[in-house]
C-alpha cells in the first residue's frame, strides 16, 4: 500500500488492487468505510473503501454493448449478475508513475487490441 499524508489527512492507496483506496482518514477518523484486513490480504477490491469505475460506471444491460452499429459482449464480473458492471479498471493492477509524501500518480492503459480486449472494445487511459 502507498501511504499519503497531508496535514491531518491520510490516504492509503492500493494500485495493485484495481487502483483502490484502502483508507481515507482525518486525524485517525475514517472518512470512507474501512477496508478489512481480509480484503487487503485477498485482494478483493469490492471490500476496499473506494475504487475507480472506468471506463464506465454502473451497469450495461445483459453485458452487451451496442455502439455505432456493432455489438460487443462484455464480461460479467459478479456471479449471478447478468450485467457488465463498472468497467474493467477495478479488475486490473494500476502502474505507479510517481509517489511523494502527499501525492501519487497511478495509471491504467487499456489496449483494445491486446489480450484483455474482450473486457472493453475501445482503448483508453485512466490516471488518478
Model-identified regions with their sequence ranges:
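Surface-exposed acidic/polar loop and edge beta-strand patches at domain peripheries
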Residues: 1-127
